[in-house]
A protein has these predicted regions:
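Structural motif
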Residues: 3-4, 21, 46, 88, ...
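Positively charged, low-complexity/disordered segments
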Residues: 1-11, 167
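Generic alpha-helical segment signature
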Residues: 5, 71-74, 89, 204
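N-terminal leader/targeting and accessory segments in enzymes
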Residues: 8-80
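Pocket-edge positions in alpha/beta enzyme catalytic cores
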Residues: 4, 69-70, 141, 199
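Phosphate-binding loop of NTP-binding sites
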Residues: 78-213
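Short, conserved micro-motifs enriched in small and acidic residues
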Residues: 2-3, 40, 63, 143
Length: 213
């Protein structure tokens, strides 16, 4: 795993947050550099809003009494922290990951249906929705941010699910949203020259490399 540096305080935190609009008192906040907003540039404001621990990829300003954790990759750190925060729920499930250029959604629902017919209780995370028991949550991304993935795993465990079938996008892999998940089975549907562009992958080679993670 990437190296990390902790200084200068050890602090208990109440919640894990990565969205600066959702900072809560005494939380651990993970700075993420996005396409249009980089929370590394707003750490003093985030600390004033209540964060007691700030995780960042580069040295940032924090007030006295706030713990700063420096990591090589904050998205990777968020994934590992989220798993720990929710008590590693994926270890209590059989997780099946499905990736590929085309067919992920169809395959995910097919596998879910087959397993349910065999008597298993199955959760699903995918492009259309996340399904946890009788609860259906509309999706914003094929593979949600790692914090949400782990939160959904925890809710599946609580709901009595034995298996989770999830779509795994190349963007999700590239951004470490699935880092640390102990996949029981991986299914690769196909690979085609798609998702190439300034907001996705720079080249087909990069796209293929992400699919192979």
């Amino acid at each position: 795993p990437p190296r990390s540096t902790l200084f200068p305080y050890t602090t208990l935190f109440r919640s894990l947050v990565y969205d600066s609009r959702k900072v809560t008192k005494d939380c651990m906040f993970v700075c993420i550099k996005g396409a249009a907003y980089d929370s590394h540039d707003h750490t003093e404001e985030i600390a004033r809003a209540g964060a007691k621990v700030i995780v960042a990829e580069r040295p940032v300003k924090v007030p006295e009494g706030v713990t700063l954790v420096l990591v090589e990759d904050s998205r990777y750190a968020l994934s590992m922290l989220s798993a720990a925060y929710f008590d590693h729920p994926a270890q209590k499930l059989k997780v099946i990951g499905i990736t590929g250029t085309k067919g992920k959604t169809t395959t995910t629902f097919m596998v879910k249906g087959i397993l349910e017919h065999a008597g298993y209780k199955v959760g699903l995370i995918g492009t259309i929705e996340t399904i946890i028991g009788d609860t259906h949550i509309p999706s914003s991304n094929t593979t949600p941010e790692s914090y949400l993935v782990q939160k959904y795993f925890a809710q599946m465990v609580e709901a009595g699910c034995q298996i989770c079938v999830m779509e795994v996008s190349s963007q999700g892999l590239m951004m470490h949203r699935t880092a640390g998940i102990p996949f029981e089975i991986g299914i690769f549907t196909n690979l085609a020259p798609d998702h190439i562009g300034p907001n996705e992958h720079a080249s087909f080679e990069e796209y293929a490399a992400c699919k192979g993670m």
